[in-house]
Structure formats: C-alpha cells, structure tokens
Amino acid sequence: MVDFNDLSVELKKTELIKEDLRNLSHIINNEFSYFCQNENKNVSFNNNISSYYNDDIFSKSTLNNLYTSWKLEDFSHFDFSSILDILKRNQYVMCSIYFLLIFSCIYFLTLLLYTKCIKTTLKKWFCRYCSENINENNSNHNEQRTVLQNVINKSCYFITYSSIICLLLFLLLSGITYMHYFIKTKKGIHSNICNIYTRLDKFLLNKCLDPKKVDTSCYSAEHILNDLSSILEEYKKVKQQAKDDTLLDENTPFPLLERYITTFNKLNVLKNNINKNNTTLENEYFHTYPALKGISETLTTIISEGNKNFGNARNVIKEVKSTIKYSFHTVDETIRNVFKDSVPKITGLITQAGKSIKGINNKYKIKERIPKYTNIILLTNIILLLPPFLILLGIIIFMIFILMGYIQKNNNFFIKLFGHFSAYFGLLTIIILSFGILFLSTSVIGGTSCILSERILKNELRFDILNNTLIDYCIKNESAPLIDDDITTSFVAKINSFDTGHIDHNINEYEKHFTILKESFFHKSLKFMDYIWIVIMKRENNTFLNRIRTEQVKKSLLITGIINENIKYENMEAIGIRSYLTTLNKIIFPENNGKICFNDIICEKENNTYNITENSKTTDQKYRNIRDGMDEHLRNDLDAIVQLFVYKARILKENIFDINDLDSNEKNKIGWSEYTPRNINGTQKKSIINTFLVNVIESINFSEIINFFDKMRDQFNVLKDLILLKIDTLTENTKCNKLVKELINVRKDYCNNVVLNLSTLSVYLIIFSITSFLLWYLFLFLWFYYNIKPS
C-alpha cells in the first residue's frame, strides 16, 4: 500500500497550503480590515456582464465633460508627460490655473496697499480731491442734510453688510458641502480598498455565506484545495474499503464467499428447526404444520441447487479482484500526475500573491498614510472655515449695533479689520483654489482612466500593451475557462478510460443462476408463507383421532384448525373451531340439551354447557353431567374430541417451540402466536421463520455478491464523478467572465465612489474659492473706501 501512503503525504501538503492561505489572509486582514469598518460588504454575482453597468453612476454623470481632454496617442507611451498633455488640453484645469496665477500676482500687489507709505499717499490724494468737491457744494443747509445723510449711510451699511453676510453664508455652505464630499471621497477610498481587500480575501479563503455551498462569487483557492482533499479522501476511503474486503490480495479468501457457505449451514439449521418443532407438535400435541412441511421440502431443493454455483462464484471473484487492482493502479497514476502538475502552479500563485501584498504594504504604508493625510486635510479645511464663521458673527453683531445707533460712522472700529479680512480671503482663495486644481487634475486623470477602462472592458477599445495578456484574452472570450483546456480534457479522458463493462458481463452471466434459484424458491415457498401459522390435526398415528367412530365427525375434524374462523388457502379449506363445534353440537345434542364451546368465558357460565380450555379434563364433573345426557354411542367420540381440543387450547397457550438454534439470545421456548404469528386484517406479522428464511435466502443469493461489486464499481464511479465534478466546478468558477466581472466591480467602485466624489469635491472647492475671491474684493474695496476717504 505504498501508493496509499504517498497520497496521504499529498493530503498533508494540501493542509499545509491551506494553513499558509489562512496566515496570508490574517496578514491582509491586519493591514486592510481598517478600511472595512462600518462596511457591510456582500458582493453579489450575476452571470450577465451587461447588468454590471446598470448601476454605473459615473457613466451617467454630467461631470463626464471634465474627462474629454484625452487622446489615444497619450497612451501609446504613457508617462508623466502624457498626464501633463491631458491636463493642458483640459479647459477647466487650465482656466483654473490661469486664474490662480493672475490672482496670485494681483493679491500680492494689493498687499502693498496696507503699507504706511502707500496708504498715506493715497489718502492725501483722495483728501485733496474730496476738499475741492466739498468747497464747491458747501451750502447753508448742512443741518437738514446731516439727518438725511445718516439715514442714507445706515441704508448703505445695511445693504453692504447684507451682501457680505450672503457671501459669507454661501462660502460656509460651499465649504460644508465640499467637506461633505471630501468625507464621501474618503469613505469611497476606504470602500474601494475594502472591496479589493474583500475580494483578495475571498480569493484566498472560503467566505461564502453557506460554507458548504459553492458560489461563483466566493470561489477561492481554499475551495480548490478542499476539492483536492475531498478527491484524496474519497480515494482513500475506496482503497481502504477494498483492502478491508481483501480485494487487493488474490490469495486471501473472500469474506462474502465464506458467508455464502455459512448461509447454506443456516438453511440446514432452519430446516432442522422446522422439522424438530413440527415433530414436537405432532408427537406431543397430535397436530401438524402443513405449510411448514412444504417449506422444509423446498429448502432441500434450494441447498442442492445452490451448491452447484459455488465454483462459478469463485471464478468471477478472482477475475473481479484482478480488475480492481488494475483500476487502483490507473487511479494512483492519474492522481499522482495531477498533483505533480497542478499543485506547484497553485502554490506559486499563492506565494506570489503574498509577496505582492506584503510589498505594497511595506512600500506605501496605506493604512497609516491614507487616514493620516485625509485627516490632516480635513482638519486644515475646518480651521480655514473658522475665521469666515467668526467674521460672519462679528458682522451680524456690528449690523445690529449700527441699526440700534450704538456705533457712529466715525467710530467704526470693526471697519478697520476689513483690510485683514481682505488679506485672509485672498490667501484663502489661493489655498483653496490650489487644492481645487490639485483635486480637479486628479479627478480628470481618474475619470479618463474610468472612461478608458469601461471601453476596454466592453471590448470597444484596444491597446497594444494588453495584447496577448490574460485580460485581453478574457475580454474577447468571456465564457472561456482560465484553466487550459488540454489539462482538463486529458484528465477527463484518463478518468473515462476506467471501463468496467467486462466485469458487468461476467457478473450478470453468473447472476442468472442465482436469479433462477431465487425465483424457484419464492415460487415454491412464498405460497406457504401467509399460511405457515395454520395448524391442523395430525393424520398418522393419532391415538385420539383413531378412537372416533362417527365418520361425519371425524372427517371434518381432520381439517379443523386451532382458531375460531374458517380459513381458505390455495385449494384447501381449514374449518374454524366455531363452525366445527356448531355442527358437532347439533349432532351430539339434537335436542339442545347441552353445548360444547371452546375458550368461551360467557359460554362457561351458562347451564348445560362445557367450555374447553387448556386445563379441561374428561373427568370434570360439569363435563360428565353433559356427557351423561347424550347418546351413549357418541360419548367415546366426544371424549376423544374434547381431549384433542384440549391440545388445541394448549397449543394456543403453551410455549412449545424451541428457537435457540435460530436466535442464540432466545433461551426460552416460544408459543404458537410468536413462532408462526397469524396475519389479521391485512396486518403483516413476520414470524421468526419467515424473517430467518427470507433473510437467509436473500443472503445466499448471488445478487449479494453482485451488489457488493456493484457497490465497488459505484464507489469507483463516485470517485470518478467527484473528480469530474471538481474539475467542472473549478472550470465553471474560474471562467474569464469572473475575472472580467471582478475588474468591472473594481472599476465601478473606484469610479463611482472615488473619482466621481473627487470631481464633485473639486467643483465645490472652485466654487468656494470664487466666493472667497468675491469676499476678498469686497472687503478690499470697503477697506479702501473707509480708510482712504477723509473723516
């Protein structure tokens, strides 16, 4: 059994590989499970690839106009300059960049206005211009105009500050919105990484909702190893069973054949038991089993005919043993070759996957860097939004004080801060617009990759770089298997070469002998089975029967059973005790001055009656009284009849039959109702004789040997079917459409959850920066107006 032990070693190797998979899954889980917090991932699977685009939000988004600046030549030699070319052709990116450059120059120039020298010069020039206008328009109505001017000033304050408040509110709203989309983008990145991690984990280990059910969406390397293990386990079981059944050693007696010989001895035991108990019934109780005597004769024929087929059985078993040994040799070679060719490839893929994941982990530190940088950016944005919020509160309070008259125009200390506000919003515009351009550029490149990948996956666009690759092959052949057809075809051919047809022919040839034997037995003996419980009077050497002189009484007594009912079987009829006694009472008591009954408690209580039981005697006084009242020539006949009926009652009550030779656990004798139970109202009660006989006959039938080898052949077929099933499962669950669907899912998660949110985020950042620019301009104007004009 060297081959058997070698396969056990291979089985241990598969377990070690599975352990490596679990360790690798643990490493991936430690690194990437962080991104799956609060995620409920249930990856669905659909055979229709087109349905995977139904929920593709990216393809239907109006933001697709942002991603139209690419050309095919950009990807002929894709590098950093290609990215710059795409961005240069994007009008939105370039407009934002130009605006940023121009505004930055203007902003830094306006900072000169806050210097004391420039501020003094501008104020002198403005004051000179104002003085000339004031002298020309000076009049005697200054007092009335002062009231009107105050009203106009307050209205101007209200309108101006209301505009500022609206812009600040819009700024905060756009800021909150872009923070919302920033968080969505962050979650999208987490979700995308989580999806990739989940799919990698499902590729390694069995993560199906029902671990026992193979699902294409979660078919994994562990499934492949489990399939290999199940093939080995099934093969070990078949081979071990063959070893236990001595099928691998032609010199060892075949157990079933030994049982076959033992079975014939059991038939002799049964025959002897029937003869022994029937002899007891005849000699001690003057009754007999007519059906059992027929069965005994049939057993003699069965034993004689069965022995003739023993030689045939020996020859067919020898031939089958030789065939099974050859089949095991073929299976051993096939499985060994499969392990030799396939296991290194699988382990190589697993090892390479582990190295790649560890390399990405060590190089990029994804888990640490992504949360770190996203949190820093988010915190920075929150800090940048705090000053606009405080300015908004300050202006609202300032407006309230102006309306209430607490602050005069010459005492507007808050207005002095407008220069600082302008400087802040200008700087905020530059910072936010820079972020916006960065995110917009990233989203443009990301969106371009989404559009290209969609067209590639739909086989609408091809790149030379993908030629002769697995992805290119699978896109063109969605239903093609990833595994080479030659591997599965050659393997299936080897498995299907296991031809057991010649075994079937030989076994079926010898089966005919035993089929004829079985049919002969059931034809001869089954007709007795329903009536083996019938007991009638013994004809030969029956002392009591011979005493009866009245022929009318004696003849019907011969076929009277031991039960009350009449029984018909075959072409014979057994008279029931009730019928017989009714006729007997009419004969011996024509004047109804007496009555004989049998096991009848009610009758026993009546006058001029005698109830026969197992304890009855012809010397009983009640019987003597009835006997004395009948014709004298019938009295001796009645005595004999009563004594025979006492034996009938004893047969019904006493334990007569010894079955220890049939059942070694049964030491005590049993009664008639147990030895040969009666079938009443269609109820089938199996006697120990019936059960023993049928079981023995079935067991000696060669069909048991046939069934055994059918079972062995079925086990080989189960092994073959299992291997074919696992190959089909592997092929079906590793088709190209699975790879394409996984790529579509990764693309869809990336484009919908990351690129689209990032594009929306960049739009709101630009809106925010434009609003900040307007606030910069407004505060700069107000500062210039209030600080340069004369008091």
Swiss-Prot record:
Disruption phenotype: Conditional knockdown results in decreased growth rates of blood stage parasites that can be rescued by the treatment with hepcidin, a specific ferroportin inhibitor causing an increase in labile iron levels in erythrocytes.
Record's subcellular location: Cell membrane
Induction remarks: Expression is modulated by the levels of iron ions in the environment.
Keywords in alphabetical order: Cell membrane, Coiled coil, Glycoprotein, Membrane, Transmembrane, Transmembrane helix
Coiled coil: 225-284
TM stretches of this protein: 93-113, 163-183, 382-402, 425-445, 764-784
Membrane topology note: Multi-pass membrane protein
Official protein name in the record: Putative iron transporter
Biological source species: Plasmodium falciparum (isolate 3D7)
